[in-house]
Curated annotation (Swiss-Prot):
GO cellular component: cytosol
Protein name: Triosephosphate isomerase
Stated role: Involved in the gluconeogenesis. Catalyzes stereospecifically the conversion of dihydroxyacetone phosphate (DHAP) to D-glyceraldehyde-3-phosphate (G3P).
Enzyme class, spelled out: isomerase
Length: 261
């Protein structure tokens, strides 16, 4: 099954809403419409930027989409600081990232919570980008495939086969995030294939064949082509490089098969 590549730019805690507008305008200017026929491009800004991004995307009829960096497992109520999927849907979000390693590490989020957040995203019409990935000690011990498969199972617990078939999975080895270290294309393919095989067990091979599995971890315009060229890697969750409109547009164009804009 042919899967359209997805390039998702995770801005993390960077850029106020004025800077967000400037960056989206830069991406839109640098990446002509023709590329969007071959690659889906989305930005994942901080919550405070979403309304500004929505206004720009809707007003200029841009083809890029946007999403949120997290979503609450709760619909509404006395949950100070939480953001409901219903709010994100009203803002026109397409995606919600859940289970990013920084949420798992700094906010003690476990697989059960990640699965609950993924379910909440689906409930409100959002597509969850479900993140998994191993630490360096697991990689060096040679247990990375088993670790990621187990984390995948836990992070999808309770979802229906149809929901699993509609999710996006992002493999981000923790040791490669923001470090400049990048898993080789072969390393990325090894884990992403194991992810797809397990999705086949959890849902069905037919549904698994349609799931987009992304790689994340120090992705840039120099390495994205080889990574996305792997059989089971369908795009990238991009961190630092997504804050540079020119570089983000370039790597999106590369994922689309070129030529460079």
């Amino acid at each position: 099954m042919s899967r359209k590549p997805l390039i998702a730019g995770n801005w993390k805690m960077n850029l106020n809403h004025f800077e967000a507008i400037a960056l989206v305008q830069k991406i839109a200017f640098s990446l002509p419409d023709k590329y969007f026929d071959k690659v889906d491009v989305t930005v994942i800004p901080p919550f405070t930027d979403l309304r500004s991004v929505q206004t720009l995307v809707d007003g200029d009829k841009l083809r890029l989409t946007y999403g949120a960096q997290d979503v609450s497992q709760h619909d509404s109520g006395a949950y100070t600081g939480e953001i409901s999927g219903a709010f994100l849907a009203k803002l026109g979000c397409t995606f919600a990232v859940v289970g990013h390693s920084e949420r798992r590490t700094y906010h003690n989020e476990d697989d059960a919570l990640v699965a609950a957040k993924a379910a909440a995203a689906f409930k409100h019409g959002l597509t969850p980008i479900i993140c998994i990935g191993e630490h360096l000690d697991v990689r060096e011990a040679g247990n990375h495939v088993e670790y990621n498969v187990n984390q995948l199972r836990g992070s999808l617990a309770g979802l229906s086969a149809e929901q699993i078939g509609q999710a996006v999975i992002a493999y981000e080895p923790v040791w490669a995030i923001g470090t400049g270290r990048v898993a080789s294309a072969a390393d990325a393919q090894e884990v992403c294939k194991a992810i797809r095989d397990e999705l086949g067990n959890l849902a069905s091979p037919e549904l698994a064949a349609g799931v987009r599995v992304l790689y994340g971890g120090s992705v840039n315009a120099k390495n994205v082509g080889e990574i996305v060229g792997q059989a089971d890697v369908d795009g990238a969750l991009v961190g630092g490089a997504s804050l540079d409109g020119e570089q983000f547009s370039m790597l999106s164009a590369i994922a689309a098969g070129g030529p460079l804009p």
